[in-house]
């Protein structure tokens, strides 16, 4: 039997991620959300000059075999280093999607400031260890850069996001702020992360789904979504913190 679990969080009022929902003249509503807020993916262009955009990254980089590493012992603003990952990550294979599970959201809801305050973070040694494993992508259920804790107090510059610099700089995509990773009981499983189809974007909101019961690679990845390329509905902004942004 094949079962699936969705790992995207709800879009609702948030102290750090501005969102707005309003109705138009039809039986519909318009949603305004940051593409790097809530559950989303990062393409290398998010932080890396001349890095690949979401359009240039093949969808199968976000789909395939995944391996789970439990890093919950690092809750409470503790670093995730290479020594811990070496001990916990024995099941990692080249080309996997690596899923780092801290269970942060189970202890501190991501709508609270404590979610950032008590999040673990990857230090440089941990980030480099992940790159050495040559994964397709990495999934996080926590804000993985130490510098992210300062976002509510000051403008954090691009170079301070060292985990982003190391991992996106190695052409490895992120899936950030996943939830319900505690429901995953297997060390290896299939994971599909389905991003919104934004033209030449440095990332976008996505829905990661873990699937259990598939025995082999018996699938083909085809994107059937239309591109949001109308300037009336898609606008990009260059921020002071993320100074590469969209192309």
PLM regions and their residue ranges:
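Active-/binding-site microenvironments in catalytic and ligand-binding cores
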Residues: 1-247
